[in-house]
Amino acid sequence: VASGGPKRRIQLTGFRGREKKALVELLFKLDCVFLDSKKYKNCTHLIAKKLCKSEKFLAACAAGKWILTKEYIINSAESGRWLDETTYEWGYKIEKDTHYSPQTQSAPKRWRKELMQSSAPGAFHRWKVILAVKEGGKRMMSVIRVLQAGKATICSSQNMGSDITHIFLHNKFFLLQNEKHFPEDQCYPLQYIEDYLLE
């Protein structure tokens, strides 16, 4: 059986309605914990309907988790046991006729292998981050979960140490208001997080 070790913790992203319901029914036939949440919940395997930039997709990439196609669930359920993940991983085959670059398509596989080989705890483990953005919005909480999944250290802008590596800004206007505090070469738009993972 391919399913040695601890139970798989499965999340889904991009599935709705009937399709999601059918996959969840199959999951109940398999030995796993299904985490039904819109937020990333430290799953071991993310099943994605398509390549996307959802919080769960980015967080799973940053944490080096398996990101797989739905066939992984369907075929495993048919076999009555978990199959080997390799051929079901997003990035296993690079598609030609898609608007996603080969680099983006291979991102899940690339990060999983890189983090496994380097034993790094996450894609952002060397980052010390300040979020110079409006507090508490939904998007903000989502960005924080992605950064935490990749093991970034998030610092408050009050204690601006010299070892800060990245300052993320909502927009340039914020920078103008706070120009004295932030060294320009450490300032990045939020978009950079996505690009760093997928490009």
Label the model's feature ranges.
Residues 2-4, 38, 51-128, 132, ...:
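BRCT (BRCA1 C-terminal) phosphopeptide-binding modules in DNA damage response/checkpoint, repair
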Residues 6, 11-49:
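The feature marks the first
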